[in-house]
Swiss-Prot record:
Homodimer. The lineage of its organism: Bacteria, Pseudomonadati, Bacteroidota, Bacteroidia, Bacteroidales. The active site is at residues 66, 134. Keywords: Cytoplasm, Endonuclease, Hydrolase, Magnesium, Metal-binding, mRNA processing, Nuclease, RNA-binding, rRNA processing, rRNA-binding, tRNA processing. This is Ribonuclease 3. GO terms for biological process: mRNA processing; regulation of gene expression; rRNA processing; tRNA processing. Belongs to the ribonuclease III family.
Length: 308
């Protein structure tokens, strides 16, 4: 896909050619701007200041890579499984881009050995490798564009490390997915058993409810407590994706919980004002979600036009 002849010639005259070769072995092509890739490997615990005084780490690239990765995997899955319904495609994509899978892939390609971080941070962040993988995809997108991202995922990741047929048949663990989302975004999630009864055949049934920041995310029923929690988590994930009102409520609740205790005490002494809990922050977070969706849509549209 890529012509590396000119890049190889330039490489002979570079002092940092070892870094270029390291990324070439991982990506299958040479970086144009290696500094972007180096930033993708810089954890926030070792942030550095730019000439303009802005802190540099891989968080912004992780944000971008998360969106691009969703689009690329959706593109690949859509074309691989012709005739399959939207639900099947969504679930298959979710299994590939979930944090557990990304952590494993990062280790498989040796990305974990290149991440720069403090020793203390490594023991407290089990998602560091997966986050760096997303940041790497963001770096590829900025440096080489969407086609390079798709090439990387198809030929360097999915080909060697992921069996699409097998992973498409794997059952989705909605509860784990919700907990993973909550941990990454620092939301409090709890499951409560509401009722326990029997159906007409005297089989035990359970109804559970999931609460996100104390707000009901959904209810689910099943023939075991575990199954009812899975169904409730599935409803909550749907709300997180599609219900803007629910998103605004849980962001406001999270903001109120994270306020310093003295500020909460002062606000409690004043008359209540509906919707007055730091709306700027919640709107900022919501705008971030809108940007993600916009990037995904634009990237998918571009990909389908290029491959039409």
């Amino acid at each position: 896909m890529f012509s590396n002849i000119k890049d190889r010639i330039r490489l002979l005259f570079r002092k940092d050619r070892e870094s270029y070769l390291r990324f070439y072995k991982m990506l299958g092509f040479y970086p144009k701007d290696i500094s972007i890739y180096e930033q993708a490997l810089l954890h926030k615990s070792l942030s550095v200041k730019s000439e303009k005084g802005r802190l540099l780490n891989n968080e912004r690239l992780e944000f971008l890579g998360d969106a691009i990765l969703d689009a690329v995997v959706a593109d690949i899955v859509y074309k691989r499984f012709e005739g399959k319904r939207e639900g099947f495609l969504t679930n298959t994509r979710s299994k590939i881009v979930q944090r557990e899978t990304l952590n494993r892939l990062a280790i498989e390609i040796g990305l974990d050995k290149l991440i720069k971080y403090t020793a203390r941070q490594s023991s407290h962040n089990s998602y560091m490798c997966g986050n760096a993988f997303e940041a790497l995809v963001g770096a590829i997108y900025l440096d080489r564009g969407y086609r390079a991202c798709k090439y990387f995922m198809e030929h360097r990741i999915i080909g060697p490390y992921i069996n699409l047929e097998k992973i498409s048949r794997k059952e989705v663990n909605f509860k784990s997915k919700l907990i993973e989302w909550s941990q990454k975004n620092r939301f409090e999630v709890t499951f409560e058993l509401i009722t326990q009864s029997h159906d007409q055949g005297y089989n035990p049934t359970f109804e559970s409810e999931v609460l996100v920041e104390g707000i009901s995310g959904g209810k689910g029923t099943g023939y075991s407590k575990k199954e009812s929690q899975q169904m409730a988590a599935r409803v909550a994930l749907g709300k997180i994706k599609n219900d803007s009102g629910f998103i605004e409520c849980i962001f406001a609740a999270k903001t109120a919980r994270e306020l310093p205790q003295e500020e909460v005490t002062v606000s409690d002494s004043k008359p209540s004002d509906s919707g007055a809990v730091t709306p700027d922050l919640s709107l900022e977070e919501i705008k971030k979600t809108d940007v993600v969706e916009q990037i995904i849509s634009e990237a998918e549209e571009k990909a389908f036009k290029e491959n039409a």
